[in-house]
Amino acid sequence: MPSDLTSKEYMRKSMTTMMMLMTSMFGCAACSSDGASKEAADVSENDNVPTDFQIQYTTPVPSEFFQAATQQGTIELVEYDSKDYTQSSRPATHKPAYVYVPYGYDPSKQYDVIYLLHGWTGVAEEYFLGRSGNSRTGLVHIFDNLIQRGLCRPFIAVSPTWDKDNRSKDWGESTREAAVFSQEYVNDLIPAVETRYSTYLTETTPEGILASRAHRAIGGFSLGSITTWYVFEQAFAYSRMYLPMSGDNWSQGMYGGAYYPDATAKFLADLVNTSPYKNDFYVWYAVGTEDVRIDQTHNQALAMAKLTDTFNVNTFSYHMKEGGRHDFNAVWEFCYHALQFFFPTNEASAVRSVKRESVATGRAYTLSGMLASGGRGIQIIDGKKIIK
């Protein structure tokens, strides 16, 4: 508490801050415009989290990975038809997906595929070519350098859009489209991309997509992370690897990871446990310590960590970027690390040495702490102070 405030004044200011935050938008890619105030009915803190569960802190991407590699992949546009899954009476839409094809692509070989989903107001091209659509981004340089330096086996990356028109929309329409993207993903996008390139998909039937699941990953940032969780919830079996960044699952309601983390985690665990692939999946969950969406991600992650029969070291890990905000700097760093884990050149090297922090002795990021400190509070578990 600041020294120039009395206890009552501090509590009053904290409560005012909390109410303002609960009834306004943060102006970020995963915020609601409904302004509804909710009660944190089921905030999951460090209680009952296994003492050996560790947050894994990512390290910055080396600066040379943002430089152009000598062996550069290409960015190609794939267009495909898809239904409007928000309303069956509407006509089919013609949609773009931008595809990173690695240097030295050989049609006689098979390639793993990762799909990366943009956040709210984003477009399909921005991950690889920027909003202008004409400049290779830092993420593409990272792809090139990871492959050229032998840190990843060559892979194909796809940047689609869950938006039927590939343009910025209001929050309500965007969330409706994100909620049904899993149908397009399985029915339209996977067949369109993975039959055009040499992948592990041999037929476009549901059985064929299932048969190639071990070589497929999907991830996303912000509302793209929420969409990734929708895919996990609605089409879990069709992808083996998941990379949700700065966003939660909404099966229990909007921002369910923040408000109802234990119920959310149980729902996800129950879903996994009814699948024949309950021991054959991986979630690489990530957020920045200064991200305005940390409450959604962190509370859900800790709740998932309690359910060790389902989410354990073989199927789940939780990562943080120190000082990371709700921006592409964090996304690039998470992708840099996750891709080495998903597609290692040597399977034995998939688990790499990283800075770790035990939840039992480390920090607790609680919803009440976030709100009382302007959405960015880091509450030390011993309760002595709040950082920033």
Where do the protein language model's features map onto the residues?
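Residue-level detector of functionally pivotal "anchor" positions at catalytic/ligand-binding pockets or at interdomain
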Residues: 345-370
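Sec-dependent N-terminal signal peptides
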Residues: 20-25
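Bacterial N-terminal signal peptides that target proteins for export
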Residues: 4-19
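C-terminal tail/sorting-segment detector
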Residues: 378-388
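C-terminal motif of bacterial Sec signal peptides marking the signal peptidase cleavage site
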Residues: 29-30
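Conserved beta-loop-beta connector loops within the AMP-binding
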Residues: 371-376
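Non-catalytic cap/lid and distal C-terminal segments of serine-dependent acyl enzymes
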Residues: 38-347
